[in-house]
Amino acid sequence: GSSVGVHIVRSGDNTERFSEPGWPFGTYVMVEKYIEGREFTAAVIGDRALAVTEIITDRGFYDYDAKYVEGGSTHVIPADIDQGLYDEIMRLALLAHQSLGCRGVSRADFRYDGKEIYILEVNTQPGLTPTSLIPEQAAHVNISFNELITWMVDNAKCDA
């Protein structure tokens, strides 16, 4: 979680470091195509998408330090994008939440390359730290931190 162990490998990079003794992340790796573009995220609480945030970082991608170190990233909320793109990201976040059977709160991450929207992942245990995106989006739609936590506790279920 939190992008620990994520590496971006570009053409010409020395990939031998990923198979050297001392590589701390095990024998197997998952490889995905890197998608250039702007990064967005949208939170869902229950059956409602909250907002779209653009995540801006000079670190290359939204890695651990960009997420948890103060000043590691800038969150623009609401994202400064056209309404059609904004609405589509909100729709896709809610659709992903529902399609995966998520309950409570989730957050979907997206990349936009100027033409296509790509869903990167759905976070089913999103952070609640002072730099986390869920509390920011909740505040943006006038849900206080206390109200958010109360809603999460009231709607928690221990069934399968």
Question: What kind of region is each of these model predictions?
Answer:
Residues 1, 37, 125-126:
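Glycine-/small-residue-rich active-site loops that bind phosphorylated ligands and cofactors
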Residues 1-9, 18:
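Phosphate/diphosphate-binding glycine-rich loops and adjacent basic-rich segments that engage nucleotide
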Residues 5-6, 39-44, 158-159:
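Short, solvent-exposed polar/charged micro-motifs at secondary-structure junctions
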Residues 8, 54, 122-124:
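Short clusters of small/polar residues that mark proteolytic maturation junctions
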Residues 10-11, 144:
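Alpha-helix N-cap recognition
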Residues 11-88, 117-118:
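Phosphate-binding site of ATP-dependent enzymes
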Residues 82-160:
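ATP-dependent carboxylate activation and anion-phosphoryl transfer catalytic cores
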